[in-house]
Amino acid sequence: MDLGTAEGTRCTDPPAGKPAMAPKRKGGLKLNAICAKLSRQVVVEKRADAGSHTEGSPSQPRDQERSGPESGAARAPRSEEDKRRAVIEKWVNGEYSEEPAPTPVLGRIAREGLELPPEGVYMVQPQGCSDEEDHAEEPSKDGGALEEKDSDGAASKEDSGPSTRQASGEASSLRDYAASTMTEFLGMFGYDDQNTRDELARKISFEKLHAGSTPEAATSSMLPTSEDTLSKRARFSKYEEYIRKLKAGEQLSWPAPSTKTEERVGKEVVGTLPGLRLPSSTAHLETKATILPLPSHSSVQMQNLVARASKYDFFIQKLKTGENLRPQNGSTYKKPSKYDLENVKYLHLFKPGEGSPDMGGAIAFKTGKVGRPSKYDVRGIQKPGPAKVPPTPSLAPAPLASVPSAPSAPGPGPEPPASLSFNTPEYLKSTFSKTDSITTGTVSTVKNGLPTDKPAVTEDVNIYQKYIARFSGSQHCGHIHCAYQYREHYHCLDPECNYQRFTSKQDVIRHYNMHKKRDNSLQHGFMRFSPLDDCSVYYHGCHLNGKSTHYHCMQVGCNKVYTSTSDVMTHENFHKKNTQLINDGFQRFRATEDCGTADCQFYGQKTTHFHCRRPGCTFTFKNKCDIEKHKSYHIKDDAYAKDGFKKFYKYEECKYEGCVYSKATNHFHCIRAGCGFTFTSTSQMTSHKRKHERRHIRSSGALGLPPSLLGAKDTEHEESSNDDLVDFSALSSKNSSLSASPTSQQSSASLAAATAATEAGPSATKPPNSKISGLLPQGLPGSIPLALALSNSGLPTPTPYFPILAGRGSTSLPVGTPSLLGAVSSGSAASATPDTPTLVASGAGDSAPVAAASVPAPPASIMERISASKGLISPMMARLAAAALKPSATFDPGSGQQVTPARFPPAQVKPEPGESTGAPGPHEASQDRSLDLTVKEPSNESNGHAVPANSSLLSSLMNKMSQGNPGLGSLLNIKAEAEGSPAAEPSPFLGKAVKALVQEKLAEPWKVYLRRFGTKDFCDGQCDFLHKAHFHCVVEECGALFSTLDGAIKHANFHFRTEGGAAKGNTEAAFPASAAETKPPMAPSSPPVPPVTTATVSSLEGPAPSPASVPSTPTLLAWKQLASTIPQMPQIPASVPHLPASPLATTSLENAKPQVKPGFLQFQENDPCLATDCKYANKFHFHCLFGNCKYVCKTSGKAESHCLDHINPNNNLVNVRDQFAYYSLQCLCPNQHCEFRMRGHYHCLRTGCYFVTNITTKLPWHIKKHEKAERRAANGFKYFTKREECGRLGCKYNQVNSHFHCIREGCQFSFLLKHQMTSHARKHMRRMLGKNFDRVPPSQGPPGLMDAETDECMDYTGCSPGAMSSESSTMDRSCSSTPVGNESTAAGNTISMPTASGAKKRFWIIEDMSPFGKRRKTASSRKMLDEGMMLEGFRRFDLYEDCKDAACQFSLKVTHYHCTRENCGYKFCGRTHMYKHAQHHDRVDNLVLDDFKRFKASLSCHFADCPFSGTSTHFHCLRCRFRCTDSTKVTAHRKHHGKQDVISAAGFCQFSSSADCAVPDCKYKLKCSHFHCTFPGCRHTVVGMSQMDSHKRKHEKQERGEPAAEGPAPGPPISLDGSLSLGAEPGSLLFLQSAAAGLGLALGDAGDPGPPDAAAPGPREGAAAAAAAAGESSQEDEEEELELPEEEAEDDEDEDDDEDDDDEDDDEDDDDEDLRTDSEESLPEAAAEAAGAGARTPALAALAALGAPGPAPTAASSP
C-alpha cells in the first residue's frame, strides 16, 4: 500500500522565503537524535544540493522544508556513498517508518513502560518544522501514484522513477547503519556485553524511533506500492525477528483502532474509495503529535479535511484505546514539546470528525470520556448513569470534513440536543485556565544572568528546566556531535526545536519565554504562533502566518485569530460563558450567528437568543433570566416523570387528544400505560400514584392474599375511585379524588348496590369468595382502612384469613364472655364484642389493625402481613399507612360517642380469644359509618418502623393499676400495642364500682410532686402556711407551696410537662380517665408522668350523661390530635364530686385563680410581697420560684415565657445557661476568630448553631428560637432565613428569601408566607384522615357532654363556648400534628424529638404556632378559603352546572370558577387560585388607580383603532389617548401627566423637539424641548423648569401690582433670557393651549407616545406619530412575556394544592414584576432618555437632573 502520498502533498506549501529558519524548527528524532546527526558534512552536502532539488522530492521532503526549495538533484544519479548517506540521514531525522509497529510490540512497550511520554505531555509541532505528519485522515492511497499525481502535480511524475530505483538499496543501508549505531550507542553507555545489548535493543523503544518519525514514511509515497511496503517495513527493523518476518514477506498485523478511524474518515472524507488503509495506528507509540498534512489546492476534499485539523490527533488515538503516554526516553529530564500540554488538564485533542462520538470536539475536557464542547457541539454527553445518550449530529460544521467552504461556514442545522439533567453533576467542567494572562510566569529582564522576577519556585532550582537543560563543563550532553561537549551550555528539550543549543543566558530566557507563552496560551485554549512558525498546518490560509505573533482559538467551530493577548482573554471568556450555558443545557446564538432552526421564533432576527438543548424541548428565549426558570421547569418535569406524570402548562398544547384542560389551565396526565387519569391539583398526584402502587402490590401478590379475597382485578371498576383497591394506607382523602378527572369519571352505583346487597344478606350466606371491597359499605369514608370492615362473617371460618396465621380461626367474643377485654399483645389480632366499636392503632410494622365499629378484626393485621413480606411494599407506603391508622380519637356521630386514645404495654394483658360465632349487633349500621378521625402521633420513627415515643404518667399509673387489678384492666377493654400510639375504648359496661374507683383515684397524681401537710403536720418554721392544710412541692429547687388542692394539681401538671414524662424508652400506654392508681406515690426523684386526659365514653344505650365525658367538637378534636404530641395532665372532670373543676394549664394563666402559678408566685394587688425591694410591690405581679432567680414581672405571658427560659424542652436542665458554653479570660474561647474572645461570652451548644453573645439576657430568647424551630419541625416545617443555605435542590428561595420548607418525607413544598403552613398541614391531614377530618359532626352528642365541652373549649382555644363554630378552630388546625418522616434523626431537616420533648411542650406556646397569631390583621381571605367560603368577585359553577359562557372550556366538564370583575374574564379550576387571583387584582388596582384602565388580552377594550384590543394585555390612560402594553410605562406616563400638571400650573406649555410651537422666530423651534409662557401678552420662552418658577413669580408680582424688578421694554417684549417671546395677540394663549391639546400635551419628547391624533399638526402626524406607534408596538412582545406569568400564576395552583403554591409564588413574583408600581422603577429610564436628549437640549438634561419628575421616555427612542 502506498502510504506516503500526503507527505508530498504537505510539502507543496513550504513556508516560502524562510529557508533560514527551518533548521531551528526542524523536527528531529527522539532517542536516536541524542546521537545527533551522522556528520555535519551530510547536512552540508545536502544543503549544497538544495538548488537542484524540486519541491516534490520524495525522499527528502523534510530537508526541502529545512533548506528551502531544492533543485532536482535528487533525480540525478548519485554515487553509492551519497545514497547511503541520504538513507542514513533520513533515518536519523526520523523520515522513515510510517508503518505501525506490530501489535505484540505495542503490548510489550506498554508493559515495559520505558520511554513513552507521561500522560498529559503531548508532543506537538507546527507545520513545516515537524518530522512527523499524521495521515490518519488522508484520502485513500489505492492508486498511490495517481493520488500523488493529484496532490503534487508534475513533480510526482518526475520523482516516482528514482524513488523506485532507490528503494531496494535503502533497506540494507539502513539496516547496516542501524546495527552499527546501536552498538556504538550502547557501548558509549558501558553496555559491552552482547546479551545485555540484545535485551536493551528490545527494551529501548526503537519502534518509538519509527513512531516518532512515522510521517516521514510519506517520502516513500511515490514508490510503487509493493516496493514501498517492503522498504518502509525494513526501516524500523532494529528488531531482527521483525526484519526476518519482513524479509520473508510475512504480514504484520494492524492494531484495531486504525480500522475504526479509517472507516470514519473514509465515510467523512472520501467514502467512495474503499481501499483506504491508514497508517494512523503508529500514533499509538508516537511521542510527538502527528500533524495532518497540508493538501495541495487541487484537492478540495483534502483541503476541507486539513484546514482546521487539530494537531494532537494521534494522542487522541492513544487515549481512546486507553494507552498511556509516557516519557519519551530514559534520560532524567523530560523533553516536552514546544506545545506542552502537560498542564492543560482539560484538553484532549481530537481530529475534527473523529474521536469518540461522546467527546465534545477537537478539544475536549479531560473528564473521563466527556469531551470539552465546542461552541455549539455537545455530542451525546455520556452520563454517569446507566442510560447512555446516543450520539447526535453536531450543530457546528462537522468541523472540516463536511463543509467545503471556509471553516467558518455556519452549521448545517440544529442538533437534537443531548439529554442533560440538572440533578446530576455537571459533566462538562468549565475548567478554563487559572492562569492570569498569556505572559504569566515569563522572565522579563535579565540582571547578572538571573531573572529579576523569578517565578515562584520554592527550592533553588533552575526555573528553565521544564523546557531547557543545562549541561556543566563536567557533563556530556548526550548529543554526540555537539561542538560544546564538556563546556557549559544549554539544550532545548523539545525535539521540535531540534534540541537547540544555547550558550547565552539571554538566549535561554528568550527561548524559555517563548515556550512559557505557548503553554500559557494553550491553557487559555489558544495556539500561539510566532512569525517564525508556520500555522498553515492547522489553520489554512491564515493571513497572519509568518507576519506577526498571533493566537488561534482551538475551540471547534471557532476560527477566531487574535494578535492581542487581551483579546485572547476576552474571547476565552466568551467560550467560558458558552460552556457554562451548555452545562446548564442551553445554547446561545449571538446576533451574528444563525441558529439554523427555521421554526425558532427568533430565526433570522439577528438577535442574541438561547435554545434549550434537552431532547424534545423547543423552548427558545431572549432573556437570560429565563434560564433559571426554565431549568426549574425541567427539574420539576423530571420529578413528575419519575412519578409517572406529565405536567402541561396553560400555554402549552396538551399532547393528549380531547383533553379539556389543553391550553386552558395547568394540568397533569398520568403517563402510565393504559391509564387516562387527568387532574389539576398535585394533591391528587400522590393518591393516584399510590393507587398504582397498590395495584402493583396486589398483582404481584405482595400481600399473599388468597384470590378469593382479592376479587376483581384492575379490569373491573377500573376508574371508580378506589373502591376496588385494597386501601391499606387509609390515606385517600376523598372517594372522588381518584376519579376527579372529567375523562375518567364513572359512577360507582353498581358497586354500591352490590355492597349493600352483600351487607343485607346474613353472614352465613356470604360466599367465601366475596371480594374485600364488598365488605366496605359505600357510606364509609374513604379513609377507613379495609381492615376496619373485615367482618368474620364475610370470611369462611375454617379458613384462616392470613396464611401465616394458619390454625387460628377468626373469632369474636360474645357479649357475656368473661374476657370482655379481648386484648392482645402486639402483633396478634384483636377481636372485640360486636357491640363494642373498637379502635386499634396499627403501625408500620407490628401493631394490631383497626377494627371499625362492630366488625371484629381478623386474627392478624394487614399491616402486619405487609410487614411479614418486607421489601414488597415501599417504606413510604408503610409509613403513610401507619400514620393513617394511628388514631388519637374516633367519634361516632350516631351515638355521640367519643373514643379516645389509650396506650398499654404489650406484655400486660395476654390474648384471650373466645369461642363464638357472634353476629353483628343492632348498632352496626350507624357504627359502620362512624368517622375514622385518626391522627398519627409523631412518635419517633425510623424508616417506617416506630420506636416507642412519648408516654405519660397516666400510662405508668394504668400499667401499675392493671397489674394490681387485672379485672379492671379486662373491663376496660384495653388494646395493647407496642407502637406507643393511643388506642383503647372503655367498655360501656363499666360497673358503678369501677366508676367510684376511678373517681376516687383520679386526684392522686399530684402526690408524685407535692406533699400535703395538715393542720397538725410541721413542715418548716419559715412556712407561711404553717399549721394550715397546704402542699409543698418536693421537686428539687422548686419550693412552691399551695393552700389549695387545685393549685397543687396544676403545679403537678406543670412539673409533669417540664420534666419529660415517663422514663425514656418505656413502652407505656395511656388509659381512659376511669383509671386509678393503685400504688403509693413514687419518690420525687423519679416522678412518673401524670396522665393525658381521656374520658370514658357515654354508653351506647342512650344519652345518659357519663361521669367523665369528652366533648366531640372538631375544635377539641384538632387540639386532641395535637395533644397526642404533647401529653397533658388530665382535665379533672367537672362531674367528679369532691374535686373543684379547674381548667387545664394550657390556657392563659390569667384565667386561673390559684395563688401559685407553675414556677411562679402570683401576688394580687395590695398583697404583701415577699421581696422587700420589689418594684411591683402592692401591684399584681409574679415572682419566679426557680432556685435563686429574682425574676419578677407583671403579666402571666411573661411569666410563662420566663418558665421556658428555665426549662429546656430537650433535657432536664434547670438553667438556660446550661445550653451555652461560657468562656472568659480564665477559660479562653477555642475559636481564634471569636469577636468576644477577650471577654466573657456564651456560645450556643446546639449543633449547627453559631450563635454567640456576651449579653446574658439574650440567652433565653435564643433558646426560644430553637424551641420555635422544634415546634415547627414537630408540625412538619422548617424555617430558613435568607442568610442560610436550605440545602434543597432547586429551591428558588434559597438565600434569596426567608422561607419555609415542609420536611415531611417526600414533600418538596416550599413557601414564603406563614399562613401557608396551615393549609399545607391540613392538606397532609386530609391525605391521612380523609376529606372531612375536621368537620362538625351532625349531632353534638348527649347533653351531658356540653359542660365538659365548653370547659375544654375554653381551655384549648382560649375563646368562649359561643365561638365553637368551625371558624374558631382554624387556629387549632394549623397545629394539627401530621407525620414527619424520620423524626429520630437529629440531622437534616427533621429535628429530633426526644422522648420527653412532647411532654414538655406547653400549650400556651403551641398557640403561638397559629399563623394568624399576633400579626394577623384581618380574617384573611385564605382563612375564608380554608372554610370553604367564596371570596368576593368570584362565582362557582358545579360540575353539571352550565356557566353559560360560550368561551369557557370548563363548562359542564369540571367544577370551576369565574372571576366576575369587569374586564377580567379569568376562569379556573381549583379554589386556591381564587386567593392568588384576588391578590393579583389587588396589585392591578394599585397600579392602574383611577387614571388608567387595564384590559386583558382575551377581551376587547372597545377603544377605536387600538392595536392591542383582543391581542395583548394592555393599559389605557383615561386622561389622554395613550395606551401601552408595558406596565412599567403606566407609572412613567402618570409621572408625565404629573409633570404636565406642574408645567400648566406654572403657566407654561411644553413643546417637544418634534413639535412645531408655531411661535415666529422661536430659536428652539423643532430643535429641542422647550416651554412657552401662556400668560396673556407674555412671550417668554424657557428650556428648564427652574426658569419657570422665577418667571411665574414675576407674573404673580404683576398681578399683585408690585413693580417687576426687571420688566420688558414697552416695545416688542424681550424675555429675560433674551429670546423672542410670543407676540401679544389676543389669541396667542388660546392658540398655545389648543396646540398643546392637539399635541397630546406634547407627548413627543417629554412624554410617552400618545395615540395617533388626526387633529394634531403636521409634524405630529408625521415623524412623531410614527415614533409613537413604534414605541407602543415595540413593547408588545416584551409585555406578552411579562403578562404570561400572571395568567400562568393564576392557573398554576389548584385545589388545596400547596406544592403548586411553590410554582405560584414564582409566577406571582413575576407578576409583581409585571405590575411594578414603585414609581422609582421608571426613573432610570426617564433619566436616561433625558440624558440622551441632552445632546440636543442641555436644558432637558438639566431637567432630568432636577428633583422634579423627569421626562418620560420619548417615543422615538423607546426600545
UniProtKB/Swiss-Prot annotation:
Show the GO cellular component annotation of the record.
chromatin; cytosol; intracellular membrane-bounded organelle; nucleoplasm; nucleus
Ranges of Acidic residues composition bias in the record: 1674-1723
Asked if Protein biosynthesis is a keyword of the record, the answer is no
Q: Which domain of life is it from?
A: Eukaryota
Q: Which InterPro entries match?
A: CASZ1, Znf_C2H2_type
Record PROSITE patterns? ZINC_FINGER_C2H2_1 (PS00028), ZINC_FINGER_C2H2_2 (PS50157)
Asked if the Swiss-Prot or TrEMBL record annotates the protein with the keyword ATP-binding, the reply is no
- Please state the residue ranges covered by C2H2-type zinc fingers: 551-575, 610-634, 668-692, 1031-1055, 1300-1324, 1457-1481, 1515-1537, 1571-1595
Q: Which GO terms describe its molecular function?
A: DNA-binding transcription activator activity, RNA polymerase II-specific; DNA-binding transcription factor activity, RNA polymerase II-specific; RNA polymerase II transcription regulatory region sequence-specific DNA binding; zinc ion binding
Q: Which UniProt keywords apply?
A: Developmental protein, DNA-binding, Isopeptide bond, Metal-binding, Nucleus, Phosphoprotein, Repeat, Transcription, Transcription regulation, Ubl conjugation, Zinc, Zinc-finger
Q: Which cysteines are joined by disulfide bonds?
A: none
Residue ranges under compositional bias (Basic and acidic residues)?
Answer: 77-88, 137-160, 925-939
Comp. bias intervals (Polar residues): 161-171
* Any one of the GO BP annotations: regulation of neuron differentiation
Annotated Pro residues bias: 387-396, 407-417, 1081-1091
The record's subcellular locations are: Nucleus
Basic residues composition bias: which ranges? 687-698
Tissue distribution is: Expressed in heart, lung, skeletal muscle, pancreas, testis, small intestine, and stomach, but it is not detectable in the adult brain.
Where is this chain compositionally biased, Low complexity type?
A: 397-406, 699-712, 736-764, 1655-1673, 1724-1736
For this chain, the site of the Glycyl lysine isopeptide (Lys-Gly) (interchain with G-Cter in SUMO2) cross-link is: K288, K975
Write out the ranges of the annotated region (Disordered): 1-26, 46-175, 374-420, 686-723, 736-776, 824-843, 889-949, 1067-1111, 1367-1392, 1589-1620, 1643-1736
- Miscellaneous notes: Endothelial cells depleted in CASZ1 by siRNAs display dramatic alterations in adhesion, morphology and sprouting; normal behavior can be rescued by restoration of EGFL7 expression. The defects are in part due to diminished RhoA expression and impaired focal adhesion localization.
Entry function: Transcriptional activator. Involved in vascular assembly and morphogenesis through direct transcriptional regulation of EGFL7.
What protein is this chain from? Zinc finger protein castor homolog 1
Q: Which organism is it from?
A: Homo sapiens (Human)
Its lineage opens with: Eukaryota, Metazoa, Chordata, Craniata, Vertebrata
